[in-house]
Amino acid sequence: INGDWCSIYIAADNVEKIEERGELRAYFCHIECQDECRNLSGGDRIMRNKHCCVGLSFRLDGVCQEFTVVGVKDEKSGVYITDYVGKNYFTVVESTEYITLFSNIIVDEKGTKMNVVLVAAKRDSLTEKEKQKFAQLAEEKGIPTENIRNVIAT
């Protein structure tokens, strides 16, 4: 999982949040895995014990802003927990040499849950098989395939 990654597709059951100016439109930069993947570090390459640090860029009001999202891994469930636009519970669903699939449940301040899935890659496109795998993950999480957005194109 170590290295430079690029967000390719994102999908959510609340599609407005991931549209081009949506607060959850995420652009991955870099991910590092340490300590048997209890520690992930991203973007700005901050290393933190038993945390997941993912470097992300979000476009807010049309301006791209960089963030480091730090998640603490729950050792029992394997889920990373962080705060960004609510409480986030995310997992690395699958990681290969070329792609990494993420699943995230976000609970906002009102208690509303939203499912988000994202695929990041080491290249700027996916194979048809990888696209199908991502669409299948979205469907498994109750996200309609029409809610899939191509992030690399923006």
Please state what every model-predicted region is.
Residues I1-T154:
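A beta-rich soluble binding module of mature secreted/lumenal proteins
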